């Protein structure tokens, strides 16, 4: 269930800016979609508790993504505890570079949205074959920003 998070917001009854907070939370929900888990999702999470995941699959995907990025000349650190990479965006403009990746049919997210301008985020939770098939696209996008 990677990417699924459960939480809550606790607000002091003494907060004077309640209306502004609610407006901000409402806007966040509209932009991000449902950030609160629906009832069906809560039941799925409860049923999944105690399940085992073959972490070897993710290790192989991480290794594949690292090889693809290294061979294409990207600067990055191997992730140790997450299922995504944050390579440096060639040319420094993460938004422009992510748009170039789209031309290669590669989905990435600008690092600016995560407080890491000049980087981009790539998830490796897709099949290893998908990662390896993207190698040419990563190389072409990188070459366009030398």
Predicted regions and their residues:
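PLP-dependent class I/II
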Residues: 1-146
